[in-house]
Amino acid sequence: MAEKRNIFLIGPMGAGKSTIGRHLAEQLHMEFFDSDHEIERRSGADIGWVFDVEGEEGFRIREEKVIGDLSEQQGIVLATGGGAIKSRETRNKLSARGIVVYLETTIEKQLARTQRDKRRPLLQTEEPPREVLERLAQERNALYEEVADFVIQTDDQSAKVVANQIVKLIGM
């Protein structure tokens, strides 16, 4: 039997990477990982604490290591953090080690999906959330597109429907 390829989900916070990833892994009988949860597991601290103590740079170093380690496995679905693609090394590893699916969403949907979530350090600032999300989109959207094998709009679809679309797109 051929080895199952890895599937890496990228995109902004609130795009549905973790929820869609769980559905996708279940459907394909693959193991699911969320890079943020793995960082928390390995560090013994939540993402907010890592950001507070080590700053975004310290968090990104941890994220790069976790994604590097996880992407060496075979047959996994990995939901990455929204900023993971900022690292060229991470982008290269994702491209080389699996199928990269960019889950695209609008700022409006991101706001609706993240407004009550206190576990998103980049939104816990004085800057209004809309401005933060718009700035992040400007910084990151081209990087998502650069590394993506496929792009799927998640706005008005359930996680299960998006997971089904991914299965059809990648032919697994």
Curated annotation (Swiss-Prot):
> What Gene3D superfamilies does UniProt report for this protein, alphabetically?
P-loop containing nucleotide triphosphate hydrolases
Q: What is its EC number?
A: 2.7.1.71
Task: Give yes or no: UniProt keyword Nucleotide-binding.
Answer: yes
- Its annotated pathway? Metabolic intermediate biosynthesis; chorismate biosynthesis; chorismate from D-erythrose 4-phosphate and phosphoenolpyruvate: step 5/7
Q: Where in the cell is it found?
A: Cytoplasm
Q: Does the keyword Metal-binding apply?
A: yes
Q: Name one Pfam family in it.
A: SKI
The protein's required cofactors = Mg(2+)
Q: Which GO terms describe its molecular function?
A: ATP binding; magnesium ion binding; shikimate kinase activity
Q: For this entry, list what GO says about its biological process.
A: amino acid biosynthetic process; aromatic amino acid family biosynthetic process; chorismate biosynthetic process
- What InterPro entries would the database entry show? P-loop_NTPase, Shikimate/glucono_kinase, Shikimate_kinase/TSH1, Shikimate_kinase_CS
Question: Taking the first listed entry, what is the main subcellular location of this protein, grouped into a coarse class?
Answer: cytoplasm
Under catalytic activity, the entry for this protein gives: shikimate + ATP = 3-phosphoshikimate + ADP + H(+)
Could you list the residue ranges forming a coiled coil in this record?
A: none
Q: Which GO terms describe its cellular component?
A: cytosol
Recorded hits in NCBIfam families, A to Z, give: PRK05057.1
Query: What job does the chain carry out?
Result: Catalyzes the specific phosphorylation of the 3-hydroxyl group of shikimic acid using ATP as a cosubstrate.
Q: What's the subunit arrangement here?
A: Monomer.
**Designated name of the protein:** Shikimate kinase
Source organism per UniProt: Aeromonas hydrophila subsp. hydrophila (strain ATCC 7966 / DSM 30187 / BCRC 13018 / CCUG 14551 / JCM 1027 / KCTC 2358 / NCIMB 9240 / NCTC 8049)
Classification lineage: Bacteria, Pseudomonadati, Pseudomonadota, Gammaproteobacteria, Aeromonadales
